[in-house]
């Protein structure tokens, strides 16, 4: 048992905490699961799949983007999102060592 973590989180954990917090919502799980590997999807396409408002989808995308789970690129008037597989793999690999 790592009793020291009951008092203090490991160095660098703050970055990981945001990652795991972003994954703490079922809607965000569903958003991530609609992506095929290396696929880029625009906000309108994502919103069309769900029965919630576009502003709500945008909020969830922002949370995932701020946690580096998704990356985005603006093209004209559209914003395209893509799963940041490299970062997700890095976080999961590093947390195995705690």
Residue map of PLM features:
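An amphipathic, aromatic/His-enriched active-site/gating alpha helix that lines ligand/cofactor pockets
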Residues: 98
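N-terminal helix-turn-helix DNA-binding core of bacterial DNA-binding proteins
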Residues: 14-53, 75, 79-87
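N-terminal leader segment of winged-helix/HTH proteins
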Residues: 1-23, 67, 83, 89-95
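Alpha-helical residues within the helix-turn-helix
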Residues: 48, 59, 65-66
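Extended rod-forming repeat segments used as scaffolds/tethers
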Residues: 32, 66-67
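Base-recognition residues in the alpha-helical recognition helix of bacterial helix-turn-helix
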Residues: 33, 59-60
